Amino acid sequence: MRKVINSGVRLPIIDYNKSQPDQCWSRHWLPKREGTHAVGRTGGSIDQAGANMNKTMYPLKFKPILKTVVWGGEKIAPYKEVVTDQHNIGESWELSGVKGHESVIANGEFEGRTITELVEQFKGKLVGEKVYANTGNEFPLLIKFIDAKSDLSIQVHPDDELAAKRHNSKGKTEMWYVVGADEGAHLLSGLSEKITPEEYVKRVENNTITDVLTNFNVKAGDVFFLPAGRIHAIGTGCFIAEIQQTSDITYRIYDYGRLGLDGKPRELHTELAKDAIDYNVYPEYKTNYTEKKDDENVLVECKYFTTSQYDLDKPFTKDLSGIDSFLVVMCIEGRGSLTDHEDEDHTLTLHQGETVLIPATSKGVTFTPSSGMKLITSYIG
């Protein structure tokens, strides 16, 4: 399934979503879609900007957008404590500004409005002045939970330059945090040996492309940074939190010959991917970090996002006064509460599987675990 961008180039739209080694740092070496449902009420008034411009921003929760896909499993709904009759849910889009798939606020006076409407209304007050100057009314990050009951397609994402040239769009840099892993769970990230573009095409044609990809057995807590151009695939048994640029461009390289939900083979983008792939081999693809209890553990810092992990048994306060950006908080385990220092009344309960957006106007936030709580936070800057 593909859509037409105003540049006239047909844009691949696929099941899953990478970006540029020299643009990002992590703790390793670097040089309407089928099966989509929003949980809960949607809609709400759009024409409220004038009346609400002076209203106070507050921590926002969202209605998850659940995606049924051919490789999806049954873990997301119970993990998030949501009730749905959907099956084979492969993704929960926690926070999305992707056109046509925008997240809807689930709490407070802005309930029922979309994230795009709020960005248009509050601009830098919501996302940060520098962020808004660079990205405009499109919320710049796409936040997901992913449940792989079977292997995802092998794929790659174009960088900003190529995406702009072909699709009048942004590229896609992303990262994975492994929330949970079944026995034998694995994923693919990066080339294991140097190949040429011509050899890449031959290996796709003769079904041997996986022979030159780096395979990782994974466990909870593992982190992978995926710059645009890096071939990758999530494997069977992985449950992952994904942070990425707001972009829905994916080039599917290899799909194991399987059929899609419509009973037909899913489209491949062999030639488009040929020019998007980074053919370099790197000494390390997995991010190494030291986990400190009750403290901030920085996982990735790059121009697109800075992501940290917290494993808390006691309250922790994150100072946001020096950050000209929003803060996205994903609760990946346990439960507790979140208090915005801008208004002590803005204390939210937070449980496993929930995602909260802290506005850029906040000067700080305190995370208070009930009986242990693990968080992933992301901001730009």
Language-model-detected regions and their locations in the chain:
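Short acidic-glycine-tyrosine-enriched beta hairpin
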Residues: 213-224, 341-361
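Transition-metal
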Residues: 2-195, 255-284, 307
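Functionally critical, mid-to-C-terminal surface segments that flank or help form catalytic/ligand
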Residues: 268-324
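Short, basic/aromatic beta-hairpin or loop at an interaction surface
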Residues: 194-206, 325-337
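Ligand-binding loop in jelly-roll beta-barrel domains
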Residues: 136-138, 146-151, 160, 170, ...
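Loop-centered beta-sheet repeat module
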Residues: 203-251
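Short beta-strand segments in beta-sandwich/barrel cores
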Residues: 317-318, 334-339, 355
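His/acidic/aromatic-lined binding-pocket segments of jelly-roll/cupin-type domains
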Residues: 143-144, 152, 174-177, 215-216, ...
